[in-house]
A protein has these predicted regions:
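Flexible loop/turn segments at secondary-structure boundaries
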Residues: 2, 53, 172-173
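A C-terminal junction/extension of Radical SAM enzymes
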Residues: 168-194
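Canonical Radical SAM [4Fe-4S] cluster-binding loop centered on the CxxxCxxC motif
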Residues: 1-27
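A short, flexible beta-alpha/helix-coil linker loop
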Residues: 16-20, 102-104, 170-173
């Protein structure tokens, strides 16, 4: 991961435990990709922290290694017009924006106003013709809403081409075990996203 730094402080996120201390230099990231290519690896996933805190370096990495594909999980709040134009230019960076359902449920864990920022980021990415998707953390509070036809249709309408679902794990910043799913809720999600 390029960094442990993040511009948000989401409830239950492990990244908050690391603060802003862990950062790979551009040279380290470049070396990882160079070594990976020697092994035949041309697809790289980035998490964080928030990878877009390092968007300048990530774009440069994409530019330098234009024979590779880079995929980043992002909270979406740092996606702007300039980044979209740079993504068009390099053509090998794809994002999965985190969203967890309706605005109130999403912002309960991620912070006030984050849902609207993510929706704006999706609009920008779509306007620029970029391929992007979403990363959905499902909990006992949102598992039905994030698997509903209406929610999925909203994502399609926004321009999402893929959705990655993963279940909540209570680690990190003010983690709540109340958000864990019981076995029946997990089965419900499995049957909905098949």
């Amino acid at each position: 991961d390029p960094t442990s730094a993040c511009n948000l402080h989401c409830t239950g996120c492990w990244a908050a435990e690391y603060g802003n201390k862990l950062n790979l230099s551009f040279d380290d990231m470049d070396s990882i990709v160079t070594q990976g290519k020697e092994l035949g690896i041309y697809f790289y996933m980035m998490t964080g922290g928030e990878p877009m805190v390092r968007k300048k370096d990530i774009i440069e990495l994409c530019r330098k290694h234009n024979d590779c594909v880079f995929f980043a999980y992002t909270n979406g709040t740092l996606v702007d017009e300039a980044l979209c134009k740079q993504m068009q230019e390099v053509g090998n960076l794809f994002l999965a924006l985190s969203v967890e359902g309706e605005p109130d449920v999403n912002d309960m864990r991620r912070g006030e106003g984050v849902y609207n920022k993510v929706m704006h980021a999706m609009d920008l990415l779509k306007e620029h013709g970029l391929v992007f998707g979403t990363s959905i953390c499902y909990t006992s509070a949102n598992y039905k809403s994030v698997t509903s036809e209406d929610f999925i249709q909203m994502l399609v309408d926004k321009g999402c081409r893929y959705a990655l679902y993963f279940h909540y794990m209570p680690v990190g910043n003010a983690a709540s075990v109340d958000l864990l799913l019981n076995p029946e809720q997990r089965i419900y999600v499995k049957n909905r996203v098949r």
